[in-house]
Structure formats: structure tokens, C-alpha cells
């Protein structure tokens, strides 16, 4: 008599964890990091963001500790201003990288004001742990840096870069490149918080002198040193933003449409 093999029903592909974690399924994981935030934003009617970049290593009791307090204060002011806008479709949510230090300060300040706030966390072997101030349902965990940066950019009406290291520089220059090349169909306000820090770390005028950027590119940069000054710049630039009724995912310019 032939032996009968035990019958096992085949597993649904989308429940096969071994497959989903494999190299073959990488496109599915990338797509999931696009669709999950988009779905959440649609469900929670998130339209526009003001993004805070900054170090995960900055200590509140360290030499640059004042930036934690000022990031928290600025996020509170931004959120209070946003909540005062009559139309919910014109309001801005504070968004950060979802971790500690400056990121925590941003989410904490928005929470202080009673507003919703977004955290785009990234899985790392060290440093990055979600902070407790992100609004439930608006915290996301990314594996891919490029998908995380996509969501930083495409709902942003402004970014505020506080002192930071490689990660902050990477995020800042991603935004500056999108602005310079006009790959997005609307401008993003760029504030560099901490004039002395940024002028020491990046010699932007030297890039122009060497012909690496145009003089007009320097106009993308706005240096600020106090929460009040930063809020004034934001209100001047964004006060006339038109209402939207869906996540305002910026359309990338094609070569033809940019001409």
C-alpha cells in the first residue's frame, strides 16, 4: 500500500511571514510603507505638515540643551496657531522622526497645545525608539529610509531643521534638492534653526562661490534663532495656504511640466 502524505493546506501568500521577509518580497514591503501612512492620513484627514528635523543625540542638559526647550516651545506655538485656523482643512500638523531628543521635543510641544502630532520612526539598532508624545494612530515604523523621507517631503508645507548630524543633514539636503530642482509642484519653506550652528556646519556661500549652486538657491534658506521668529516666518509664508480636502500629496514635476 502506498504511504499517504499528510495533507497541509497551502498558506495564503500575504500571511507567509517567511516570504514577506524575503528578498523576493522587498517590493511588497516598500509598497506597504507607502500605503499604510497614506491610508492612515486619509482616515484621519491629515492634509499638511510642518516637519521638525534634528538630532537624536542632543541632551536637554548638554551644551546644546536649549534647543530641546525651544523646539518644544516652537511646536506648541505652531500647533496653537494651527488650531486657531477656522477651517480644519487649512491646519498643519507637527511631524517629526518620532524618536527622542529634538524629535521628542517637537511631538511633546504639539501635545502640550492639545494638537495631533505625527511620528515617522525608523528601525535602527540603536538610538531610535518611539517617543510617547506621538498621537495614537499617527505613529509609523519604517524600515526603508527613502520611504520615510518620502513621507517627510510630500505633505510638508515647511521644514524646521534644528542642529543635528548625518541624519538631519541627509533629511535637510533631500528637501533642498527637491526645492532646487522643482521636483515638487509647490514650495516648501525651509527654516534653519540656530544660525551660528548652521553657518559653522555648512558653508552655503562657498557652494555658490565655487559655482556648485546658484545665488538664487541661497534664497531657499531662512535662518532663525527664536521660536517667535520662526513662527512669524511660518505665518507669513503659510498664512494664505488654500484649503485641501485630501492628503495633499505633492505631484512630482515631469520634465515636460517643469518647462
Task: Identify the role of each PLM range.
Residues 46-48, 89-91, 113-116, 135-136, ...:
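Short coil/turn connectors at secondary-structure junctions
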Residues 192-259:
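C-terminal functional extensions of proteins
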Residues 179-187, 212-216:
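Arginine/glycine-rich "motif VI" loop of SF2 helicases in the C-terminal RecA-like domain
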Amino acid at each position: 500500500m502506498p504511504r499517504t502524505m499528510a495533507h497541509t493546506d497551502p498558506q495564503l501568500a500575504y500571511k507567509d511571514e517567511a516570504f514577506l521577509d524575503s528578498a523576493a518580497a522587498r517590493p511588497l514591503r516598500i509598497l506597504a510603507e507607502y500605503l499604510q501612512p497614506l491610508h492612515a492620513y486619509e482616515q484621519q484627514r491629515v492634509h499638511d505638515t510642518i516637519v521638525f528635523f534634528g538630532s537624536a543625540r542632543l541632551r536637554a542638559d548638554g551644551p546644546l540643551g536649549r534647543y530641546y526647550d525651544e523646539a518644544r516651545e516652537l511646536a506648541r506655538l505652531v500647533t496653537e496657531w494651527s488650531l486657531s485656523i477656522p477651517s480644519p482643512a487649512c491646519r498643519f500638523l507637527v511631524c517629526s522622526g518620532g524618536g527622542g531628543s529634538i524629535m521628542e521635543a517637537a511631538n511633546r510641544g504639539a501635545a502640550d497645545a492639545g494638537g495631533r502630532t505625527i511620528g515617522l520612526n525608523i528601525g535602527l539598532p540603536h538610538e531610535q525608539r518611539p517617543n510617547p508624545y506621538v498621537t495614537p494612530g499617527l505613529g509609523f515604523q519604517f524600515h526603508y529610509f527613502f520611504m520615510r523621507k518620502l513621507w517627510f517631503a510630500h505633505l510638508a508645507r515647511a521644514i524646521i531643521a534644528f542642529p543635528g548630524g548625518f541624519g538631519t543633514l541627509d533629511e535637510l539636503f533631500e528637501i533642498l534638492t527637491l526645492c532646487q530642482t522643482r521636483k515638487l509642484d509647490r514650495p516648501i519653506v525651509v527654516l534653519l534653526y540656530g544660525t551660528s550652528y548652521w553657518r559653522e556646519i555648512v558653508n552655503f556661500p562657498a557652494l555658490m562661490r565655487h559655482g556648485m549652486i546658484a545665488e538664487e538657491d541661497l534664497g531657499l534658506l531662512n535662518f532663525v534663532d527664536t521660536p517667535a521668529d520662526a513662527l512669524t516666518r511660518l505665518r507669513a509664508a503659510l498664512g494664505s495656504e488654500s484649503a485641501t480636502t485630501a492628503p495633499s500629496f505633492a505631484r512630482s514635476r515631469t520634465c515636460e511640466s517643469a518647462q
